[in-house]
Amino acid sequence: MKRTPHLLAIQSHVVFGHAGNSAAVFPMQRVGVNVWPLNTVQFSNHTQYGQWAGEVLAPHRIPELVEGIAAIGELGNCDAVLSGYLGSAAQGRAILSGIERIKAVNPKALYLCDPVMGHPEKGCSVPAEVSDFLLEEAAAVADFMCPNQLELDSFSGRKPQSLFDCLAMARALLARGPKAVLVKHLDYPGKPADGFEMLLVTAEGSWHLRRPLLAFPRQPVGVGDLTSGLFLARVLLGDNLVAAFEFTAAAVHEVLLETQACASYELQLVRAQDRIAHPRVKFEATPISL
């Protein structure tokens, strides 16, 4: 019997709705990965509602929880770590400490860093120290980085003027250490208004993917968290990077179609679960180069 992969997901959690782990855990489980959620934040709901209740996990608790898993002899079964929104650089360093501990018992364990800073339409939402930490420290450790356009702009210190400018910016981030950079949402002058575009960049090549852009009265939150989680899950399940990229784009599109059909602000993960596991649509990633 083939072994089921195990993944430690270190990010925020909301009681109501879907953001952070609340957007990523169930879809990763639905495609066949055992997920260990370590919630860095527990809020009543995501912050785009404008009000919320809850608390943030103190940074020192993260390595404590990792050590607790080690104490029962299970840490070596961790095949990958996913990290998302960081409230501080201290929280980020605590995550890197946990990753170091995991790699000590499983050197093959992968790390995907989702460098959450904000949304292109909503602006940056993290302190400068977090942006600096992600670029100067996390990128050197991560196997995969999954920024959106705002985050890629922040790392690059500029805005792109073309698709090929986006590619150059992603390659500059790749040079900092990751094996692959997945840009979850491209935005550049001249981009077709009816398309949603993504980019995958590795040392071996670069691939561009375009799917239809769906309209919403209010953009659902958690799409980036869903994207990063599914990409890492599919890699753990044996997909090559391009196949994982294509699967992720299709599965996320299926969720958005169901969300749109329900006229919902929150992602309709449960209603779309069968199509997350087996997307009906397919989008082809096409090779591009400078």
From Swiss-Prot:
This protein's name: Pyridoxal kinase PdxY
Alphabetical keyword list: ATP-binding, Kinase, Magnesium, Nucleotide-binding, Transferase
GO biological process terms, semicolon-separated: pyridoxal 5'-phosphate salvage
GO molecular function: ATP binding; magnesium ion binding; pyridoxal kinase activity
Protein's organism: Pseudomonas fluorescens (strain Pf0-1)
Cofactor: Mg(2+)
Superkingdom of this protein's organism: Bacteria
Presence of keyword Magnesium: yes
